[in-house]
From Swiss-Prot:
This is DNA-directed RNA polymerase subunit beta'. It holds the Pfam family RNA_pol_Rpb1_5. It comes from Nitrosomonas europaea (strain ATCC 19718 / CIP 103999 / KCTC 2705 / NBRC 14298). Its cofactor is Mg(2+); Zn(2+). Keywords: DNA-directed RNA polymerase, Magnesium, Metal-binding, Nucleotidyltransferase, Transcription, Transferase, Zinc. The RNAP catalytic core consists of 2 alpha, 1 beta, 1 beta' and 1 omega subunit. When a sigma factor is associated with the core the holoenzyme is formed, which can initiate transcription. It comes from the Bacteria. One of its GO terms (molecular function) is DNA-directed RNA polymerase activity. CDD domains: RNAP_beta'_C, RNAP_beta'_N. Belongs to the RNA polymerase beta' chain family. InterPro entries: DNA-dir_RpoC_beta_prime, DNA-dir_RpoC_beta_prime_bact, RNA_pol_asu, RNA_pol_N, RNA_pol_Rpb1_1, RNA_pol_Rpb1_3, RNA_pol_Rpb1_3_sf, RNA_pol_Rpb1_4.
Length: 1404
């Protein structure tokens, strides 16, 4: 019996470990793993199916094929356990050890490990300081390498060809040794003195001045340091013993018909063994050198193929010409070990089926088909049957269940009660894609799903399937109930808004209920309470939409939950439908909140208010009741669509006719040469775009109102003046769109307006629009034109899904180890939040931006000076309301960017957990949530890049800014301007802004003012809404004179640098600067047309404070508007640059833009930022580039070489600020980090990403983007190593530097200084400290090669590593589990040390 118990014990042993280390295996290590040498290539005997002795499946080496039975059958059964059979040499034990025991092959000649040879950069090359090409020549027997030069003039590591070698042998005899093949490389490696090499390299780095040498030396130094530190020997990169994988992991399976299916590894091993044995035989026979060489090369190639097939040369193929799957292929890629078996496992106790709607369910329930439940809950039923005594054994219980006897169904009901199950819909894009429900048994075979959770699952009922999973253990059930139950997931973790919002018919029903109809039956009746209204409605005395007056009893509640709700009775003018809804309103919500037409947005606000005021439980019940009402009244309303609902506007024909006239006119202008082809096309597209909008507007105007008809007479009602009385329309289509249930104005426009302009396959717009709509029907040409767009939509969707999924995967990978690990890191850092104002519109108010954040400094009331909220307070709805009423316009809040927690984040810097509505808990995996929140809406973004000239160019170019509110004008400190002769203020700064403050001094709007604009208001002037603040010429950019004087041209030569153009219409001649490339005279290529100013004595005017003359360069395409020798005043225009000449850039939009930002790619045609604050001057041009010099305040010059076709926004003598744009173009985020710091970078990425999502109407909290930026900035570059062990220029984790610096400061040594490095998400994922996580992401081979040389230790900090090694993840409940485990380990080790000490004392 004891033996039996021992047997069970064997299975359940569990190893406790805290980290995993990877390294190179020494030959001794490999032999110690092995249970014997594999000498023969045979696998199994094809007659007896028994493994051959000493072969690849040998039972003597790897263990018995059957449990407790040796191969020859002499020993069977448990009693012989552990005996080794003397006849066949097999140990009698479990056959399971054939999965664990390894063998080995003694190689007759050393072989290089291909990973360390070919995985770039080649590690062997770095260690030996040889090129990969040279090492390969030695390894593959094309050259000799000198291993010991002796007294000869040869160098160690020098390569000799065959002829060289023979000559040198004649010359020096055997004073030197040179070898071919891996032996030579191995000798070189084993003779290396690593500490000595490290010394000389460090010396070289300090003494040499060459950049490339330093870089190269640093790379070598890193590898050698790693070998030195890890205690591994470089010669282990050359294999002398090859380990053999346990046979069960490369199985050979007999198929029917006498054939065998085998793993490719067996083939690869067989080749290695065959070649190895042949080589041994040849060596014994003393075969000629050339034959042996060939055999050694073949051995090297076969080992290469086994380790990584296809890495070098042609891949080895099997019988069917397909490349064999090597060891490296087994672990990498989507089908490899990491992603297929470790990160994505299939689970037991699960099922899947089609979903159907279950409108009668409560929010926390789902319908589970009986058959499915029976199968899923089998073990529970067996157990119950046994305890009840219905079945004596499991077998009997099984029989009962299979016969489906009545008692089984009763037991199933009992087992299922209060046992939640998890439902999952693929693709699971965010955490709400798996939720727990209580199952209700249903007939049929489909799972029933509650309609309100569809939004979270993104499910519909057109044939979607869902999977069911059963949590087995009590802990799992508990977590399901407390964390995953659908009623606990009311808010979306992406933005904190409710995600359980009614949609479609529910919205339509509620909208219809709350609409008011003039002249409905029972209008104007007065009721004493709701129940009276219900009676009247049910007896058909009043209609649902009639306006009535009713007394309503309310229980009002304030947000601070201390006080009891107060009862009050108020009279309301309302409608019957709204009165009916007030019955289901939870106590504490005022009636006024539903006394309006309920559209989708209003319903969302309603549920949000309910959650904040009445708590979770009430809200869930309320949402359910809303749903039942919505369905019920949508049915009673009987809203449907018929053709007459599609009202085509009467003005349509006139509008189209007018547009056709305009187009005709422009065509005539084009023929007579007044407009260019491009202008004509743009204008035509503009005209039709406008016409389409006009038709749509006319249609909506007609659709949205209807005349009121009298119920009795059926006549249209008129007022005193004989005007027709109108009301909001009850047109079905209008109601659907207006309520937000389905459809939009754009779709209705196509149904009953005109379809409008269509795009060609290349994205350009076809200038003849479709004037018909779907109601009228399309003709053949119109139909053909529209097919392209429709198909492109489908193709786009498929691409989008894949791209979006890949983006999510990269985001998850970079943030997966970010968990809230402590309560407060006590930092005083944070970011200052203001309202986001663009133009005159507040895009995001201050309240939205700071809601759910923690204040970083005390928030003070500006009027009283009293502290309203202390630092460290979580700002909830009440707080942000008060901050807004106090007129505070900026607040410093904590942010994940400045959090000082080493591994992880602190709760205070993160703020509110958006999915739960309170301060985030320790253990929350905020990284993954951030990644999901950004990745999940990815499928809604567009895929394409817009070309200007497509739909984008329809927006009219702005030529002025006007205020939208009353207030006081304030100039920003960047703005610089001059006064011209007419006393107008002309702006001469590039990044100037004006903003408007209201009477409380709060910023209301902010406008960018371009260079050359005329300011029409003064700083501090009081203005009215609608006043024009500044105006400018939209299509031309001026160059403004900042000095007065006489103009002198230089290098302005007609026919050389400029040409005279006659304007066709006006007949005036102007000078236009031509492109240097088009100049015909060779020596004139370098000439730059410029202008200087002379004072009255004809001396050149200098830049104030310097001896440099003012010179202003005219750029290519400039139209010069002054004459040589003309007297000009300050603020006058010297030249104009037509805007059309600036190249139209493609605007990257949608998903590619988001990916580009997070990958931190340098955009093409990148703009330049000023490296320092200083004065601009132009230097000498080079070929094709112009040289721009900024001299800073200390007189240090910073040079730029800028391509000639780029537009430099700065000009000679202009003062620019550090980080200001000096060359137009998209900005490189790395520049922003370098010149403006972390905060500016985060702001830039945040705003840019948000712009993309905002365009699609997706709300994501800034917090999530900040979390990802934090991960992109987690590595730093060492600038000065101080007394640390870092190498200058090395990139390391920030946490590592901080820890090291703390130690150094404690010892009074020099800490290392560093700069932040911005890494793209892919790069950041690969450069993480955890090699397991990086290897499972991408580039598995490279990651593992590097890690093994470094002897890296993975501390299993992140989630991914722990999933891979099969432990609980260190997040949520797992975090506390790991912490408790660590504490226990510490106390155990402490106790262990104590006992040691006492024993020692005793012995003393």
């Amino acid at each position: 019996m004891k033996a039996l118990l021992d047997l069970f014990k064997q299975v359940t042993q569990k190893e406790e470990f805290d980290s995993i280390k990877i390294g190179l295996a020494s030959p001794e290590k490999i032999r110690s793993w092995s249970y014997g040498e594999v000498k023969k290539p045979e696998t199994i005997n094809y007659r007896t199916f028994k493994p051959e002795r000493d072969g690849l499946f040998c039972a003597k080496i790897f263990g018995p094929v059957k449990d407790y039975e040796c191969l020859c059958g002499k020993y069977k059964r448990l009693k012989h356990r552990g005996v080794i059979c003397e006849k066949c040499g097999v140990e009698v034990t479990l056959s399971r050890i054939r999965r664990e025991r390894m063998g080995h092959i003694e190689l007759a000649s050393p072989v290089a490990h291909i990973w360390f040879l070919k995985s770039l950069p080649s590690r062997l090359g770095l260690v030996l300081d040889m090129t990969l090409r040279d090492i390969e020549r030695v390894l593959y027997f094309e050259a000799y390498v000198v291993t010991d030069p002796g007294m000869t003039p040869l160098n160690r590591g020098q390569l000799l060809t065959e002829d060289d070698y023979l000559n040198k042998t004649e010359e020096f005899g055997d004073d030197f040794s040179a070898v071919m093949g891996a032996e030579g490389i191995r000798t070189l490696l084993s003779n290396m003195d690593i500490p000595l090499e490290i010394e000389s390299l460090r010396l070289e780095i300090q003494t040499t001045g060459s950049e490339t040498k330093i870089k190269k030396a640093a790379k070598r130094l890193k590898v050698l340091e790693a070998f030195n530190k890890s205690g591994m020997k470089p010669e282990w990169m050359i294999l002398t013993v090859l380990p053999v994988l346990p046979p069960e992991l490369r199985p050979l399976v007999p198929l029917d018909g006498g054939r065998f299916a085998t793993s490719d590894l067996n083939d690869l091993y067989r080749r290695v063994i065959n070649r190895n044995n042949r080589l041994k035989r040849l060596l014994e026979l003393r075969a000629p050198e050339i034959i042996i060489r060939n055999e050694k090369r073949m051995l090297q190639e076969s080992v290469d193929s086994l380790l990584d097939n296809g890495r070098r040369g042609k891949a080895m193929t099997g019988a069917n010409k397909r490349p064999l799957k090597s060891l490296a292929d087994m672990i990498k890629g989507k089908g490899g070990r990491f992603r297929q078996n470790l990160l994505g496992k299939r689970v037991d106790y699960s099922g899947r089926s089609v979903i159907v709607v279950g409108p009668q369910l409560k929010l926390h329930q789902c319908g589970l088909p009986k058959k499915m439940a029976l199968e899923l809950f089998k073990p529970f039923i067996f157990n119950k049957l046994e305890t009840m005594g219905v079945a004596s054994t499991i077998k009997a219980a099984k029989r009962e269940v299979e016969n489906e006897s009545p008692i089984v169904w009763d037991i199933l009901e009992e087992v299922i009660r209060e046992h939640p199950v998890m439902l999952n819909r693929a693709p699971t894009l965010h955490r709400l894609g798996i939720q727990a429900f209580e199952p209700i048994l249903v007939e049929g075979k489909a799972i029933q799903l509650h309609p309100l959770v569809c939004a979270a699952f993104n499910a519909d009922f057109d044939g979607d399937q869902m999977a069911v999973h059963v949590p087995l253990s009590l802990e799992a059930q508990m977590e399901c109930r407390t964390l995953m139950l659908s009623t606990n997931n009311v808010l979306s973790p992406a933005n904190g808004d409710p995600i359980i919002v009614p949609s479609q018919d529910i919205v339509l029903g509620l909208y219809y209920m709350t609409r008011k109809k003039i002249g409905a039956q029972g209008e104007g009746m007065v009721f004493s309470d709701i129940s009276e209204v219900v009676r009247a409605y049910e007896n058909k005395v009043v209609e649902l939409n009639a306006g009535i007056i009713v007394r309503i009893k309310e229980r009002k509640k304030s947000r601070s939950h201390g006080e009891e709700p107060v009862e009050a009775i108020t009279r309301y003018e309302t409608t019957v439908g709204r009165a009916l809804i007030s019955e289901i309103l939870p106590a504490g919500l005022p009636f006024s909140i539903i006394n309006k037409v309920l559209k989708k947005k209003e319903i969302s606000k309603l549920i949000n208010a309910s959650f904040r005021l009445c708590g979770l439980r009430e809200t869930v019940i309320f949402a359910d009741k809303l749903m039942y009402s919505g369905f019920s009244y949508a049915t009673r309303g009987g809203i449907s669509i018929c053709l007459d609902d599609l009202v085509t506007p009467s003005q349509k024909n006139d509008i189209i006719h007018a547009a056709e006239q305009e187009v005709h006119e422009i065509a005539n202008q084009y023929i007579s040469g007044l407009v260019t082809q491009g202008e004509r096309y743009n204008k035509v597209v503009d005209i039709w775009g406008r016409a389409g909008d006009q038709v749509a507007k006319a249609m909506m105007d007609q659709l949205s109102v209807e005349p009121v008809t009298d119920r009795e007479t059926g006549q249209v009602r008129a007022d005193k003046n004989g005007q027709v009385v109108t009301q909001e329309s009850f047109n079905s289509i209008y109601m659907m769109a207006d309520s937000g249930a389905r459809g939009s104005a754009a779709q209705i426009r196509q149904l009953s307006g005109m379809r409008g302009l269509m795009a060609k396959p290349d994205g350009s717009i076809i200038e003849t629009p479709i004037t018909a709509n779907f109601r009228e029907g399309l003709n053949i040409l119109q139909y053909f034109i529209s097919t392209h767009g429709a198909r492109k939509g489908l193709a786009d969707t498929a691409l989008k899904t894949a791209n979006s999924g890949y983006l999510t995967r990269r985001l998850v990978d970079v943030t997966q180890d970010l968990v809230i690990t402590e309560d407060d890191c006590d930092t005083d850092g944070g970011v200052i939040m203001k309202a986001l104002v663009e133009g005159g519109d507040v895009i995001e108010s201050l309240r939205e931006r700071i809601l759910g954040r923690v204040a970083a400094t005390d928030i003070v009331n500006p009027e009283t000076g009293a502290v309203i909220y202390a630092a460290g307070m979580l700002l909830d709805e009440d707080a942000v309301d008060e901050i807004e009423t106090c007129g505070i316009d900026e607040v410093k809040v904590r942010t994940p960017l400045t959090c000082e927690t080493r591994y992880g984040l602190c709760a205070k810097c993160y703020g509110r957990d958006l999915g739960r509505g309170m301060l985030v808990n320790v253990g929350e995996a905020v990284g993954v949530i951030a990644a999901q929140s950004i990745g999940e809406p990815g499928t809604q973004l567009t895929m394409r890049t817009f070309h200007i000239g497509g739909a984008a160019s329809r927006t009219v170019v702005a030529n002025q800014v006007e205020s939208k509110s009353n207030g006081v004008i304030r100039y920003s400190h960047h703005i610089r301007y001059v006064k011209n002769a007419q006393n107008e203020l002309i702006v001469i700064s590039r990044s100037g802004e004006v903003y408007i403050q209201d009477e409380n001094g709060r910023e209301r709007e902010r406008h960018k003012i371009p260079y050359g604009a005329t300011l029409l208001v003064q700083d501090g002037e009081v203005i009215k809404a609608g006043q024009i603040l500044a105006s400018w010429e939209p299509h031309k950019r001026p160059i403004i004179a900042e000095y007065a004087g006489k103009v002198r041209f230089e290098n302005v030569e007609e026919g050389v640098t400029v040409v005279r153009q006659i304007d066709e219409i006006t007949g005036l001649a102007t000078l236009v600067v031509i492109d240097p490339k088009r100049r015909n005279v060779a020596q004139s290529k370098g000439l730059r047309p410029l202008v200087k100013f002379l004072d009255e004595n004809d001396n050149e005017i200098n830049i104030p404070g310097s001896d440099q003359p003012v010179s202003i360069t005219f750029h290519v395409g400039s139209i010069i508007t002054v004459r040589d020798g003309q007297q000009v005043n300050i603020g006058e225009v010297l030249a104009r640059i037509p805007q059309e000449t600036s190249k139209t850039r493609d605007i990257t939009g949608g998903l590619p833009r988001v990916a580009e930002l997070f990958e931190a790619r340098v955009p093409k045609d990148v703009g330049f930022l000023a490296e320092a604050t200083g004065t601009v001057a132009f230097g000498k041009d080079t070929k094709g580039k112009q040289r721009l010099v900024i001299t800073d305040l200390d007189g240090v010059a910073h040079e730029y070489l800028i391509p000639k076709d780029k537009h430099v926004t700065a000009h000679d003598g202009q003062v620019v600020n550090k980080g200001e744009v000096i060359v137009d173009g998209p900005i490189d985020p790395h520049d922003i980090l370098r010149l403006q710091g972390v905060e500016a970078l985060a702001r830039y990425i945040s705003n840019e990403v948000q712009d993309v999502y905002r365009l699609q109407g997706v709300r994501i909290n800034d917090k999530h983007i900040e979390v990802i930026v934090r991960q992109m900035l987690r590595r730093v570059q060492i600038m000065n190593a101080g007394d640390s062990s870092f190498i200058p220029g090395e990139q390391v984790e920030r946490a590592e530097v901080l820890t090291e610096n703390e130690k150094l400061i404690a010892e009074n040594k020099m800490p290392a200084t560093y700069e932040y490095v911005l890494l793209g998400i892919t790069k950041a994922s690969l450069s993480t400290d955890s090699f397991i996580s990086a290897a499972s992401f991408q580039e598995t081979t490279r990651v593992l090669t590097e890690a093994s040389i470094m002897g890296k230790k993975d501390d299993l900090r992140g989630l991914k590593e722990n999933v891979i090694v099969g432990r609980l993840i260190p997040a949520g409940t797992g975090l506390s589990f790991h912490n408790i485990r660590k504490k226990q380990r510490l106390s155990e080790s402490a106790a262990y040390l104590d006992t040691d000490l006492t024993e020692n004392e005793v012995t003393e």
